[in-house]
Each structure stands twice: as C-alpha cells, then as structure tokens.
Regions:
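Acidic-glycine-rich active-site phosphate/pyrophosphate-binding loop
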Residues: 1-9, 45-52, 99-105, 156-167
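Claisen-condensing/thiolase-fold acyl-transfer catalytic domains that form or cleave C-C bonds
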Residues: 10-12, 18-40, 145-207
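Short beta-strand segments
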Residues: 19, 43-50, 76-77, 88, ...
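Short, well-ordered, mixed-charge alpha-helical segments that flank or form enzyme active sites
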Residues: 24-27, 52-56, 93-95
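Flexible, glycine-rich active-site loops centered on histidine and acidic residues
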Residues: 35-70
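Condensing-enzyme catalytic core mediating Claisen C-C bond formation in acyl metabolism
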Residues: 58-124, 128-131, 204
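Phosphate/ATP-binding catalytic cores across multiple sugar-kinase/actin-like superfamilies
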Residues: 125-136, 159, 163, 189
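Phosphate/pyrophosphate-binding loops at sites that engage ATP/ADP/AMP, CoA/4′-phosphopantetheine
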Residues: 128-145, 193-198
Length: 207
C-alpha cells in the first residue's frame, strides 16, 4: 500500500507483500503472471527488496560477510501472443538451514545460516531446476540467450556454469559488489544486464 501511495496509483490497484526470502522474486514474478492472465490488467510491477542488515548478527563472521541490502524492480506485461513463463516452483522445509529464530513467536532475532549445508543443497538444487525447466520447455542450454543466477555464492554459480558448459558471456555475477541481497538479487542482475544492453526484447532468459 505504501507503493500505491508513493506512485499515486488508483485505489483499485492490487498491492501486497510476498515473503519468500531468496526465492521471493521468482515466486512474485510467477504470481504476477498468473494475476495478469486472470484479469484485464496489462501491467504489473514486481519488486524485490531486502534490508538484511536489520537482522544480521555482526558478531557471526560466517554469516554477516555474506549478505547485503538492496532493491530492484521489473515491469511485467503479458500478451496472448507471447509465450508464458515456464516456472518450476517448490520448497524444502525439512531442514532449517537458514532461519531467523523466534520469528514464529514474534520475538525479534537475528538471521542464522548453516553455510555448508546451504552450499551442498544449492549445488544440487540449481542443476535440478535447470534440468526441469529445460525439459518442460523442450529447450537446450544452447537455446538460452542468458542465465540469470541468484547471487548467493560465486562458487555455486561457477559450478553450474561449468556443469552445463555455459560460456562466461552468457551469465553474470555481481555478488562481489552487493553480497547476497536475497529477493533483490535477481532484479538487480536484470537491471544491470539491461543497462549494459546484454538482454532486451526477445531474449530467452533462464532465471
């Protein structure tokens, strides 16, 4: 609702928060596509924003050096003649590798992450998701113009690129500038790629 006010949008504008941490932007993007296709509205604004410094434990050197604050946004338009977004969504809640203890009780607390477990999970999950999306769309790695990876860890990105033989000019890293900005990570990458002219109308992008 703050955005509706600040942007002076009509009162029938649909505004809501979606909290899904690092997957937040992807969930929001898919949700926006569903909303646009189910209504007569033409455009949607998807924003990924994080202020992780508020919940960072600055005494935990294994965690505090990883995260950063950031925000990015994209305008989404859906047309009948355009292909829809082919999304693979899911969750893995059996092992609390990344958590903010006390949140469920409304107690202010700081973020905690088991870095080794998260790394091992991501190294397996990223290729799995790539395989699923390519299989769903009937495309190959060569058909993809650009790969937009969540900027959580440079090694995870490099391992995925090595596994699929993705050339350096087809993926991008900015984690060295901002750290892991969670839900803001992907729109920040998209914004920089757009500014550089790397992706544009008609680009086939795997996020």
């Amino acid at each position: 609702c703050c955005l509706q006010r600040e942007l002076n949008l009509p009162h029938d504008t649909v505004c809501f928060d979606l909290n899904a941490a690092c997957t937040g932007f992807l969930y929001a993007l898919h949700t926006m596509e569903c909303l646009l296709n189910a209504s007569e509205r033409k455009y949607g604004l998807v924003i990924g924003a994080e202020n992780l410094s508020r919940i960072t434990n600055w005494k935990d050197r294994g965690t505090c050096i990883l995260f950063g604050d950031g925000a990015g946004a994209v305008v989404v338009e859906c047309r009948p003649e355009w292909p829809s977004i082919s999304a693979i969504l899911g969750c893995h809640g059996t092992d609390q590798m990344l958590r903010v203890p006390g949140v469920e009780k409304g107690v202010p607390s700081l973020i905690y992450m088991e870095g080794t477990k998260v790394f091992k999970f991501a190294v397996e999950a990223v290729p799995y998701c790539i395989d699923q999306v390519l299989a769903k769309t009937g495309k190959t790695v060569d058909d993809v113009d650009f790969f937009v990876f969540h900027q959580a860890n440079a090694r995870i990105i490099d391992l995925a690129a090595k596994k699929y033989h993705i050339p350096p000019e087809k993926y991008y890293k900015n984690i060295q500038k901002y750290g892991n900005t969670s839900a803001a990570s992907i729109p920040l990458v998209i914004s920089e790629l757009h500014e550089m002219g790397t992706v544009g109308p008609g680009s086939r992008v795997l996020i």
